[in-house]
Amino acid sequence: MAAKDVKFGNDARVKMLRGVNVLADAVKVTLGPKGRNVVLDKSFGAPTITKDGVSVAREIELEDKFENMGAQMVKEVASKANDAAGDGTTTATVLAQSIITEGLKAVAAGMNPMDLKRGIDKAVAAAVEELKALSVPCSDSKAIAQVGTISANSDETVGKLIAEAMDKVGKEGVITVEDGTGLQDELDVVEGMQFDRGYLSPYFINKPETGAVELESPFILLADKKISNIREMLPVLEAVAKAGKPLLIIAEDVEGEALATLVVNTMRGIVKVAAVKAPGFGDRRKAMLQDIATLTGGTVISEEIGMELEKATLEDLGQAKRVVINKDTTTIIDGVGEEAAIQGRVAQIRQQIEEATSDYDREKLQERVAKLAGGVAVIKVGAATEVEMKEKKARVEDALHATRAAVEEGVVAGGGVALIRVASKIADLKGQNEDQNVGIKVALRAMEAPLRQIVLNCGEEPSVVANTVKGGDGNYGYNAATEEYGNMIDMGILDPTKVTRSALQYAASVAGLMITTECMVTDLPKSDAPDLGAAGGMGGMGGMM
């Protein structure tokens, strides 16, 4: 086991604070509308330019191990805020730095660290309740666009794109961000349910100009098995031919004689058919077939529940207004399933999302909800260079997370104003002893830090602006972009309540632990092996190689 270096008391805390300050100072230059960029060197390729707090934090690793411990703990604050709300990482870092700095001053002055932590926790719990009370629901398109704009660093086009995407696919719809091909940002909306499986034979194509299969008002046969014998399907094919409608077959696979017969029937115009493989694998495939059945009002023909393909009737088939199939995807538009059944299925999947343990499962379940509930929107980010594309894409993703958080828990006045108002409302809060009261004051002082940093990044005097804002009430604050005072909500400067709440809670959590640190232990650096170059009669020649 390697030898350890141990530091106690003030020595340990001073080192830790130095690490905290290095990381926080690098992150906080990005805060606010006039925040600056940070350039991150990469071991290969061009450097990355970012204004995203958590991206900056993740890059920082310090040489001194004690300082690095402090930096890594604040990195945890940024990461946790990012995981919970997808934004607010810089705010969380600024709050943590302020609580740690003020808290360690109090410890150095002889306060009890445990009581300080209890005071901080008490103030934060009260502040969270007040934030919830201040929160205003965010439901209309204008508010969503404003939240997106602020989070994308005052880029109005991004805010509008996100609001438009949410309008089109609903609050539950899936919105993804991809690299675009041009200079302009684009929004691509896929309505209905789309899955990544194309036609099984190009002979099904009936729109040669687009290379797609389009079926109007088709019946949809869903089978959880491989179909290779055409005899199994004859009763269904005959019934569909009599009805004079096209048929879409979604099965585990359609092969051999069955596929050949379907192709011949289609080419002769006896019955218009297209076949695709079912999406997913294993249990996920069964679940997705059931989703399609719910959406189209059909039944999955599965031997597990004793159903046989030969005995299937038109009642077992689903229906949709239109189906479009190309070589990679199938889109079912306007299934005829009952709204109540679809909502029931969505609720069931939501329950599974709550219980999911892995991010991958959660993401896949979320996609299934979106496909049932509305559709999928893709924001294609346009930029002139790859470096700009990466930076912009990160901003758009942040803005998307922020708008989701706003829809979930509502919004409060932005620009650090909400925390100032909350601090004034709980200013009379008292702890059980004087040390706890100091802890409460430390937390209240920290709640001013985001506003002060935003103002500092504008080149103005933080104390003057902070006092003016404190003198106002309600949503009165300072618009750093235009350097004007006024109603923040009217000016469209909003922060999602969830982002502000998460930033405060995670900052206080980690800062409280750091204030109560009394000892730090790390590995001693390994000393280099002695230089053996002088051995073997080469006196005085050591290190010549």
UniProtKB/Swiss-Prot annotation:
Chief localisation class: cytoplasm
Binding, ATP: 30-33, 51, 87-91, 415, 479-481, 495
Pfam families: Cpn60_TCP1
Record field: catalytic activity: ATP + H2O + a folded polypeptide = ADP + phosphate + an unfolded polypeptide
CDD domains tied to this protein: GroEL (cd03344)
UniProt cross-references to InterPro entries, sorted A to Z: Chaperonin_Cpn60_CS (IPR018370), Cpn60/GroEL (IPR001844), Cpn60/GroEL/TCP-1 (IPR002423), GroEL-like_apical_dom_sf (IPR027409), GROEL-like_equatorial_sf (IPR027413), TCP-1-like_intermed_sf (IPR027410)
Entry-linked Gene3D superfamilies: GroEL, GroEL-like equatorial domain, TCP-1-like chaperonin intermediate domain
Localization, UniProt: Cytoplasm
GO cellular component, one term: cytoplasm
GO MF annotation: an example: isomerase activity
Keywords, ordered alphabetically: ATP-binding, Chaperone, Cytoplasm, Isomerase, Nucleotide-binding
Summary of subunit composition and partner proteins: Forms a cylinder of 14 subunits composed of two heptameric rings stacked back-to-back. Interacts with the co-chaperonin GroES.
Designated name of the protein: Chaperonin GroEL
Organism from which the protein derives: Salmonella agona (strain SL483)
Classification of source organism: Bacteria, Pseudomonadati, Pseudomonadota, Gammaproteobacteria, Enterobacterales
Gene name linked to the record: groEL
